[in-house]
Amino acid sequence: MKKGIELFKSEIYTGKKTTEFEKTVGLKLPVLFKYFCEMFELGQECFLNAKRSFDDILLPITSVNYVDLKENINLRISHFYELKELQSRWKEDIEFSEWFKTRNLLPIAYEEINLGQIFISLSQNDFGNIWYIGGYENDKPIYLSKNIFEFASKLVETEINDEDFKNKQVYKNWGEDFWRVKE
């Protein structure tokens, strides 16, 4: 199973995505977060987690979790938001409400179990720190890490319990990047 940054699809660094985002949205991003956004593919398919073919659809057989055993935190991360998506939604989406903007929290990833979000702080006193806020009204911010790479280092690939197949029943054909289930 993969862990840390080996879970991400890499991209060629250009520096253009973050520069355009900062100009359009009017926010200054932390340097390490800029590198992260430029080095790795973001969006719905950002992770290299294992998938299987099911009726011509690729379904994940593993999930990506943020795990901090010391703090007893385990969050299933669905995906990281693409900068273009954030850029277009920042000023108009209720999901990115004034509450987050006034606290200088930029949503960067979606947590799928509690419908929460992972945020990066843009405020001076904790610039670049990573926080989690659950999807419920009274959920309080939870500190996760001091920067995006420390956060990414705690990501691990874990198996999804699926009654349709057992792991011993899967195989890959040469050149395929997904698993097939033996019939």
Please give the residue ranges for each predicted region.
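Short acidic/polar mixed-charge low-complexity motifs
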Residues: 114-116, 138
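Compact, glycine/acidic-enriched structural inserts
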Residues: 131-162
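Structured loops at beta-to-helix junctions and adjacent beta-edge loops in soluble globular domains
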Residues: 109-111, 123, 133-135
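Short, surface-exposed beta-strand/loop micro-motifs that present aromatic residues
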Residues: 116-123
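A broad, low-specificity signal marking well-ordered, structured residues that form hydrophobic/aromatic
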Residues: 105-106, 118, 131, 142
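A surface-exposed partner-binding patch
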Residues: 1-113, 179-183
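Acidic, proline/glycine-rich low-complexity IDRs
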Residues: 150-183
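A short alpha->loop->secondary-structure connector
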Residues: 127
